[in-house]
């Protein structure tokens, strides 16, 4: 198994799909990395040399991925909550942030119904 950015990349998948298992790397960025390094996107991860793997690691190190990205997202949400702005209040109350209706929908975000006693 190839290990990139602390994640085990599945060896039976194509390199473009395997790179997407890293948090912060989607389809566009995975294809961009393949083009930059002149790798064929449909090459299986198992067929990539150690040299190419090291080049991929160096390229991915340029981006904010995995733990750093998760931490940044958590800090952004915490900042909104601390500011007390509309989005922060909605985060605190576990309600939708972007104007969706909540009278009949948003059950996933609001959680299970609470019984009134």
Curated annotation (Swiss-Prot):
GO biological process terms on file: translation
A Pfam short name: Ribosomal_S13
Keyword Amino-acid biosynthesis: no
Residue ranges, annotated region (Disordered): 94-117
Keyword rRNA-binding among UniProt keywords: yes
Superkingdom of origin organism: Bacteria
GO cellular component: cytosol; small ribosomal subunit
NCBIfam families xrefs: uS13_bact
Protein name: Small ribosomal subunit protein uS13
Species assigned in the record: Vesicomyosocius okutanii subsp. Calyptogena okutanii (strain HA)
Gene name of the record: rpsM
């Amino acid at each position: 198994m190839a290990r990139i950015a602390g994640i085990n990349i599945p060896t039976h998948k194509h390199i473009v799909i395997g790179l997407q298992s890293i948090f912060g790397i989607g389809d566009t960025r995975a294809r961009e990395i393949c083009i930059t390094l002149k790798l064929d996107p449909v090459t299986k991860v198992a067929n990539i040399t150690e040299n190419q793997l090291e080049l991929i690691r160096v390229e991915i190190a340029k981006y904010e991925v995995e733990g750093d990205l998760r931490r940044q997202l958590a800090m952004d949400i915490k900042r909104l909550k601390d500011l007390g702005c509309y989005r922060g209040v909605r985060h605190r109350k576990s309600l939708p942030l972007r104007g969706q209706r909540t009278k009949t929908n948003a059950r996933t975000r609001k959680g299970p119904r609470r019984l009134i006693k």
